[in-house]
Amino acid sequence: MEFAFYICGLIAILATLRVITHTNPVHALLYLIISLLAISGVFFSLGAYFAGALEIIVYAGAIMVLFVFVVMMLNLGGSEIEQERQWLKPQVWIGPAILSAIMLVVIVYAILGVNDQGIDGTPISAKAVGITLFGPYVLAVELASMLLLAGLVVAFHVGREERAGEVLSNRKDDSAKRKTEEHA
């Protein structure tokens, strides 16, 4: 399992560097997904199976879906035909494909290398994780959720385009301003 730890760690570092250096947000999201899956592989190789599963479900699943929706709302991905043709070029998808293939080899190696006597660690139940998470760390969990929500709202407002005739609010001051702009 030491081999799996080092390979997953290397993949996580390389994918994270690509997230930071990539200019296209859609490609950066793909590398971020690979990085999160590699980090879950690190957890699995260390014997923290529950933490690895949570990493996949929460981060690589739920939060990445949130990021994809934000990119779609901001229209950062672009849906032009020429850009979609560029995405099919090998230099775009070969990096994530190679890293994913290495992760597949590591996962198959880890599955085949499991001993028949079971897991050597003490299992941690979801109830114990929940009690710990929402006991002494409840403030941190709530602050993290508020931070994610604030980031989503800010990204929406920054990326939103103003359209002619769009009603932004129902306040009296805004409606009077809108009427003067329409007559001007």
From Swiss-Prot:
GO terms for biological process: respiratory electron transport chain. GO terms for cellular component: membrane; NADH dehydrogenase complex; plasma membrane; respiratory chain complex I. It is found in: Cell inner membrane. The chain crosses the membrane at residues 1-21, 28-48, 54-74, 92-112, 138-158. Residues 49-53, 113-137 are periplasmic. It is a multi-pass membrane protein. InterPro entries: NADH_UbQ/plastoQ_OxRdtase_su6, Nuo/plastoQ_OxRdtase_6_NuoJ. The keyword NAD applies. Gene3D superfamilies: NADH-ubiquinone/plastoquinone oxidoreductase chain 6, subunit NuoJ (1.20.120.1200). Its EC number is 7.1.1.-. It catalyses: a quinone + NADH + 5 H(+)(in) = a quinol + NAD(+) + 4 H(+)(out). Keywords: Cell inner membrane, Cell membrane, Membrane, NAD, Quinone, Translocase, Transmembrane, Transmembrane helix, Ubiquinone. Pfam families: Oxidored_q3. Residues 22-27, 75-91, 159-184 are cytoplasmic. GO terms for molecular function: NADH dehydrogenase (ubiquinone) activity; quinone binding. Composed of 13 different subunits. Subunits NuoA, H, J, K, L, M, N constitute the membrane sector of the complex. Belongs to the complex I subunit 6 family. NCBIfam families: PRK06638.1-1. NDH-1 shuttles electrons from NADH, via FMN and iron-sulfur (Fe-S) centers, to quinones in the respiratory chain. The immediate electron acceptor for the enzyme in this species is believed to be ubiquinone. Couples the redox reaction to proton translocation (for every two electrons transferred, four hydrogen ions are translocated across the cytoplasmic membrane), and thus conserves the redox energy in a proton gradient. This is NADH-quinone oxidoreductase subunit J. The gene is nuoJ.
